Regions:
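Structural motif
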Residues: 86-89, 176-178, 206
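The feature captures the conserved acid-bearing segment of alpha/beta-hydrolase catalytic domains
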Residues: 196-292
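Conserved beta-strand elements of beta-rich interaction domains across eukaryotes
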Residues: 16, 81-83, 95-97, 139-140, ...
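Short, surface-exposed "cap/lid" segments of acyl-processing enzymes
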Residues: 61-142
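Alpha/beta-hydrolase active-site loop
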Residues: 116-119, 123, 127, 137-175
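Gly/Ala-rich beta-loop-alpha elbow adjacent to hydrolase catalytic centers
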Residues: 179-189, 207
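Short coil/turn segments at secondary-structure boundaries
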Residues: 101-106, 137-138, 145-147, 191-195, ...
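N-terminal targeting or regulatory segments adjacent to alpha/beta-hydrolase or S9 domains
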Residues: 1-72, 84
Length: 292
């Protein structure tokens, strides 16, 4: 298997070159073998996307925890993400097997790198002069000497996002933080806002969620962090309505609009242009306020 023009293709046996045939899950009558084959391919894709983050879009690795113990993990950022005063885009994926740089492994395998990875978001942000930092919230433990050990600062997704905020984003020069959070990533951001509200409010300009699974209940509605999120955020949800059409939203919740697709995993890709238009509008409002 290899990627050709961003799409996974099977190699032709006769030529060794990529053909027209895409990934096939069923390569054997043994269901367990097929699953192991799929998971092994997923592991290769993770490393391939990591390489693209460094070679194609020029990101660098930052350790988690900051002073690496064993075990440890890493996030990715543009070289000047922590020192530039330009807007800083934070990307937070959902739960499951995805790692930094991915929105949906199934899309990478069955559709394309464009729809399944965060690379289009990174390229768009860099084109607009923004810095970028992407989290890696699903790498929570490592096996060392046969024993699974939790990673300090990354024992679960919520802890990972909190650690990255406290140790990297909070001290970054930029006070124009823009967040994109997909699915469970939205829950992580809600928890971050609740835990770190003073610094969150001082740095965050806008939050774009894509089919977020968070929940702001009525008991939260009067809390400051919930009010801030409801004003500064928008949630693009899977829907059969046209892109950006308003969806029903409970009182006190983050406003919901259509992502222009009924597929959960496609929401981030489908609403990319709308997300950046939302960010630009939020930045303009901030700049006008600063000029007063």
């Amino acid at each position: 298997m290899c990627f050709l023009e961003g799409k996974l293709r099977k190699l032709e046996k006769s030529t060794g070159e990529p053909g027209e045939e895409g990934f096939q899950f069923q390569v054997s009558d043994d269901g367990d073998y097929n699953q192991r084959h799929y998971e092994a391919l997923g592991d290769v894709i993770t490393e391939y996307v990591y390489d693209l983050l460094e070679t194609e879009v020029g990101l660098v690795r930052l350790p988690v925890p900051v002073n690496p113990d064993h075990p440890s993990t890493f996030i990715f950022a543009s070289p000047n993400a922590l020192t530039a005063d330009a807007p800083l885009v934070i990307l937070v994926h959902g739960s499951g097997v995805v790692r930094a740089g991915q929105w949906a492994r199934s899309l990478i395998i069955n559709d394309s790198l464009q729809s399944g990875t965060q690379i289009p978001y990174i390229k768009k942000a860099r084109e607009m002069g923004y810095e970028v930092l992407i989290t890696n919230s699903n790498e929570n433990s490592k096996v060392i000497n046969g024993k699974r050990i939790a990673i300090k600062g990354s024992s679960n997704a919520v802890a990972h996002v909190s650690y990255v905020w406290k140790n990297y984003i909070q001290g970054a020069k930029s006070n124009q933080v823009l967040i994109v959070a997909h699915s469970y990533g939205g829950h992580c951001i809600v928890e971050l806002a609740r835990e770190m509200f003073p610094s969150f409010k001082s740095k965050v300009v806008a939050v774009a969620m894509t089919d977020s699974v968070h929940r702001l209940s009525s008991k939260h509605a009067m809390e400051k962090y919930a009010k801030f999120l409801s004003l500064a955020s928008r949630n693009w949800v899977s829907s059969d309505l046209p892109l950006d059409e308003p969806e029903s939203t409970r009182e006190g919740e983050i406003p919901r609009v259509s992502a222009g697709t009924v597929k959960h995993e496609l929401t981030s890709w489908s609403c990319l242009q709308s997300v950046f238009a939302f960010f630009e509008a939020a930045l303009r409002r901030t700049r006008r306020h600063d000029d007063l």
